[in-house]
């Protein structure tokens, strides 16, 4: 996980529980608000979408761009965060 943000490392370091969507790497207040408006208020709801898309990086990034207008970097950071979390806990 070299080159990852502190936010990414913090998220991947422990079970997800009831963390807010804004605790995901790449998701700040603006994107978090857009995701919440779309019904994705908790990190586990975004994880659910990631799993529904069968962990496919391009599909997930496209979904992020469509739902909350994430940039490529934001979508990539979120994907990598969820992917690393799944490797650790699933």
Curated annotation (Swiss-Prot):
Cystines in this chain: none
SUPFAM superfamilies: Barrier-to-autointegration factor, BAF
Domain of life where this protein originates: Eukaryota
Main location: nucleus
GO terms assigned for molecular function: DNA binding
SMART domains hit by this protein: BAF
Residue intervals passing through the bilayer: none
Any one of the GO CC terms: cytoplasm
InterPro entries noted in UniProt: BAF, BAF_prot, BAF_sf
Sorted UniProt keywords: Chromosome, Cytoplasm, DNA-binding, Nucleus
The keyword GTP-binding is annotated on this UniProt entry: no
Gene3D superfamilies reported for this sequence: Barrier-to-autointegration factor, BAF
Example GO biological process: chromosome organization
Coiled-coil zones: none
Phenotype when the gene is knocked out: Death at the larval-pupal transition with small brains and missing imaginal disks. Specific abnormalities in interphase nuclear structure; clumping of chromatin and convolution of nuclear shape.
Annotated compartments: Nucleus; Cytoplasm; Chromosome
PANTHER family named in the record: BARRIER TO AUTOINTEGRATION FACTOR 2, BARRIER-TO-AUTOINTEGRATION FACTOR
Family: Belongs to the BAF family.
Function of the molecule: Plays fundamental roles in nuclear assembly, chromatin organization, gene expression and gonad development. May potently compress chromatin structure and be involved in membrane recruitment and chromatin decondensation during nuclear assembly. Functions are required in both M phase and interphase of the cell cycle.
Subunit and partners: May interact with MAD1.
Record-given protein name: Barrier-to-autointegration factor
Gene: baf
